[in-house]
Structures are given as structure tokens and as C-alpha cells.
């Protein structure tokens, strides 16, 4: 019986050695078009943002947010939709420390309102959390974030 347990242990060791604590960045980011869910303030980034407060709560505001989209492409570029135009940028993320860099952000029109908030959130994004269903981007201080998801329009 002990021999059987030892055999199972030795067979499982390669699986344990192959584990990686880092995120699969492409699985998370390149999982389709993301819609803006809301902007949040407060909360504790290290504790699943307990106590974070949504900036927008009215149904019309949420619909307007969901119209804003961002698509992370495997070639390191971004394509997005604002209320009055589109935007592009470059992105890179590190799955080990969950940092993100968004650079060379260009818009086809001057962003205003919620579009401006999204553009500013992307410019200031330094950290991310999430999976292929939801994504949170936070600035360096981690005191606010934008949440993205795959929401129906």
C-alpha cells in the first residue's frame, strides 16, 4: 500500500514543479471585447476591494458605460470605442506582479464625460486584477479602479 502511495507521489511531482503562480496574460486580456462596467473609489485593493464604491448607479449611466469598449490584441495593441470616436494604444502586462502599461494612447476625437474618464483610467493604469470574465485596472496608488467585463450591449 505504501509503495502505491509513493508511486502516485512521484507521478505527481512533475505536475507540481510545472505550476506557475503568474497569470496567463493573454488568457485574461485577449478574451474578447471588454465593456466598461463602472468606476470605483475606495476599498482595499489587496482584499478584493472590500468597501469600494461605484461612481455610477443609475441605469442610464450604466448603459452609457457599457457602450465604451476596449479590445486588447495579441500584437500588443488596443482598439477601443468612445462615445464620440475611437482610440488606439499599445499595452503590455506582467503576469507575475500584475502590472500593466498602456502607452501611445491616441483618440480620433477629444474625449469628454465618461469617455474622458476611461481614457484617463487607461493612461494611469499601473496594476490589474481579473480573469477572462472581469478585469480591474488601477493606478499606482490603488485607491480607485475601472472595472471591465463582457457585458451585452
Task: List the model feature ranges, each with a label.
Residues 1-17:
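Sec-dependent bacterial lipoprotein signal peptides
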Residues 17-153:
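Lipid interaction determinants
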